[in-house]
């Protein structure tokens, strides 16, 4: 009986050891104390706290490095783990191949090269080079002298700032007119956003600009892969919408005007004219407003609660009459009316309202 009890206890102990090995949290690898310098540490399922100086660290998946107050990290290579730069901490010459570099308020990342992954900034990112991946500037965070190369994306959120940006050919900027300040150069010249006004923005390759209510955008170029979104009460004039560029707007915008492949287009005083929607573009015609001679190209969408005439719904485009869905808020209108529509292998859904003189070609409709 005693022997059986011993065997049970041994088995229980082994089970506990196995469970601990399998499910224990990441072990704390090391602490670099004030005044101490370490070189060439590889972090993989380890955590390093840096109060002193850490040089040539490699952070692999599962690894973490925390740069504490007055700590310094130099020439760190991040290959899938995390580097946190805390208040008064500094990271210099980091290379981000995957994973995250997170700059907290009061921290600084200097001359990071971003090949992939995410550099998230609540503090300061100075002179980063964005070759791939995404640099995200959060509220009250900032970046200066950022270079965005082909395949890279700089995102500046409301209340964030990006100064002296060098947007190279193929680089992308995603932002809003509520950013604190954004300025720099692109292949078309100088651009800026400040006090709710955006000038000369170039949107391409995943870049976008959101023009908020009562804000303005002037002379925006929406090239292939770019998106211009104008909210109700927003204004965008001088828009140059090229092939592959996308516009998302409603007839409640104060004014949206410019050129596309059809020539001049405009939305003003509740009337949309000659608006062509490319792949991914969208138009919402609100009640008591109208759209004239709208073209929906492949994968574009149009929702009409008002009146539209001469609408063309091309292959794989979708038109909805009498119903709109705005961020999950669904509205119906029996007053909606569509006249002289041509459906050319696209799809038109009648939820409410009236259709008059419709021409259907192809298999859909």
Question: What residue spans do the PLM features occupy?
Answer:
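The right-handed parallel beta-helix/beta-solenoid scaffold, focusing on the short coil/turn
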Residues: 34-39, 45-47, 52-57, 63-65, ...
